[in-house]
Structures are given as C-alpha cells and as structure tokens.
C-alpha cells in the first residue's frame, strides 16, 4: 500500500504544528520548511480542519495549530481523512467486480486482515511520537536557530 502525497504532507503539517507548540503556525512558513507550495498545503488543510485535526485562526496574525495535544492525534486519524480509498484489490470495491469467488475468496480475506493490521499499527503512533523521535526537529524545520558552542575569550 502506498499513501498519497496529500497524506504525507498532512502528517508533516501536523508535525510542524506540534513542534511549534501552542504558537500559531503560518502556511507560508510550513510550505517553506518543506519546500512545497502554499496552495497544496491549503488544499490539505481543509479536510484536516473539518475533521478537527487542525484549528485555524483567521486574520492578520492568524495561522493554524493543533486543537488538542499531539499525543492524542494518531496516524490513523490522519490517514482516514486524507486517503480516498483503501481498496487493495478490485474486490474491495462494492459492485466493481464480476468474480464468482468474491464471497468466498481467500485473497479478499487475507488482504482485509492485512489492511486491518496496517490500521492497527497506525493507531499505535501519534504525531507526538514522530516529533519526539527527531530531537532536532525545531532546528530542522527552521523554528529555532542552531545552538552554537560558546568560545571562551583568551
């Protein structure tokens, strides 16, 4: 299974917001950090907002932020909003197949079991887990300046 670019950047946007703490994150800043167009991020933002995964604040000093702790937002929460279909084979799509084995096929059952296992793994990881796995994330995203070692004056 391959996740879409939309899902990839939705997760990245949420990671950026989580790394930025309670401060508002602006779409141009997020776009610059990831080297992607603002328009693409705005497109992704809409379903995330409708699902309650992102909160938007309008106005001159507006932006986006997480509406709840990053530890409460799972990867599954994001994937179920951003992916259109989880059909791993045509027999997953109702009315799309003429196969006489569709109701008793072992492949269908095996793929359904694999898909459920995939969802279970995604439910075990949060946005917070991804952020904490990268100790330098704030520096990498341009949210902080690198800490430079102080040299003593001789």
Swiss-Prot record:
[2Fe-2S] cluster binds at residues 91, 99, 105. Keywords: 2Fe-2S, DNA-binding, Iron, Iron-sulfur, Metal-binding. It holds the Pfam family Rrf2. Disulfide bonds: none annotated. Binds 1 [2Fe-2S] cluster. One of its GO terms (molecular function) is DNA-binding transcription factor activity. InterPro entries: TR_Rrf2-type_CS (IPR030489), Tscrpt_reg_Rrf2 (IPR000944), WH-like_DNA-bd_sf (IPR036388), WH_DNA-bd_sf (IPR036390). The keyword Calcium does not apply. Its cofactor is [2Fe-2S] cluster. Residues 2-132 form the HTH rrf2-type domain. GO terms for cellular component: cytosol. The keyword Iron-sulfur applies. Required for growth utilizing PHB cycle intermediates. This is Protein aau3. It comes from Rhizobium meliloti (strain 1021) (Ensifer meliloti).
């Amino acid at each position: 299974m391959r996740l879409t670019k939309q899902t990839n950047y939705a997760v990245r946007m949420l990671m950026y917001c989580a790394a930025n703490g309670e401060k508002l994150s602006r779409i141009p800043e997020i776009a610059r950090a990831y080297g992607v167009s603002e328009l693409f991020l705005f497109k992704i933002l809409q379903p995330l907002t409708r699902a309650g995964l992102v909160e938007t604040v309008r106005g001159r000093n507006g932006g986006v932020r997480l509406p709840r702790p990053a530890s409460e937002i799972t990867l599954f929460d994001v994937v179920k909003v951003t992916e259109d279909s989880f059909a791993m084979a045509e027999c997953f799509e109702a009315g799309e197949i003429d196969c006489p084995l569709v109701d008793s096929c072992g492949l269908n059952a095996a793929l359904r079991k694999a898909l459920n296992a995939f969802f279970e793994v995604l439910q075990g990881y949060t946005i917070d887990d991804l952020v904490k796995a990268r100790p330098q994330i704030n520096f990498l995203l341009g949210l902080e300046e690198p800490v430079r070692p102080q040299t003593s004056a001789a």
